[in-house]
């Protein structure tokens, strides 16, 4: 009986381990992980976070280049704006990579013409990432990365459901080849999409309206 219980427990543990697939996302030299799925990546100058474990599914990643490059006979620190991209994890380790950048002129020219961020997998294959360069208002706009990303997500109808990035506009709005727009998805998805796009004043008005109605 005890043997049966033990075998059953081991089977459950094995099933649970298999069911939760994950992959490691790491960064190459001078690439800084800033935000993962809307949450700031805790890091420091002396102890930067160079990798994260991600469960299978769609994730939102924000990174930037932050490294020392040559400027004539001197060294200088070059830091870019944050870049945001979506990543579909399928139990496959990957590294975020850029070409080797050594001088200030080379680095500036590379990012000015549009950087090609890529994922490099353990088998040597690469995938070019579709990134968005985040832009803030004023010098201090990049001091709070979570807030900057939240503002972007609110504007574009992106939320996180059970830890995964979901573009509500893609889920709730369908555009055919003729450009005809069709509202799809269930009512809850549509409500979430419009709520994320609402202003603070509109959200407050909606909450008051909802409180005044009996939905039981």
Curated annotation (Swiss-Prot):
Keywords: Signal. The keyword Ligase does not apply. InterPro entries: UPF0319 (IPR018635). Residues 1-22 form the signal peptide. The keyword Transcription does not apply. It holds the Pfam family DUF2057. Belongs to the UPF0319 family. This is UPF0319 protein PBPRA1013. It comes from Photobacterium profundum (strain SS9).
């Amino acid at each position: 009986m005890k043997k049966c219980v033990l075998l059953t427990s081991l089977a459950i543990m094995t099933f649970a381990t298999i069911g939760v697939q994950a992959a490691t996302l790491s960064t190459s030299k001078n690439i800084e992980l800033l935000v993962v799925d809307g949450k700031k990546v805790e890091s420091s100058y002396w102890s930067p976070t160079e990798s994260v474990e991600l469960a299978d599914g769609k994730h939102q990643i924000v990174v930037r280049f932050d490294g020392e490059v040559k400027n004539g006979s001197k060294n200088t620190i070059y830091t870019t704006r944050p870049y945001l991209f979506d990543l579909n994890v399928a139990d496959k380790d990957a590294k975020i990579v850029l070409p080797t950048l050594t001088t200030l002129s080379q680095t500036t020219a590379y990012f000015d013409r549009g950087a090609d961020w890529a994922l490099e997998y353990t088998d040597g294959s690469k995938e070019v990432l579709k990134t968005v360069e985040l832009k803030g208002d004023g010098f201090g706009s990049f001091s709070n990365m979570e807030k900057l990303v939240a503002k972007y997500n609110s504007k574009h109808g992106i939320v996180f459901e059970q830890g995964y990035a979901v573009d509500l506009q893609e889920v709730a709005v369908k555009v055919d080849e003729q450009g005809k727009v069709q509202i799809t998805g269930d009512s809850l998805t549509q409500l979430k999409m419009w709520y994320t796009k609402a202003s603070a004043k509109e959200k407050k008005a909606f909450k008051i309206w909802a409180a005044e109605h009996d939905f039981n």
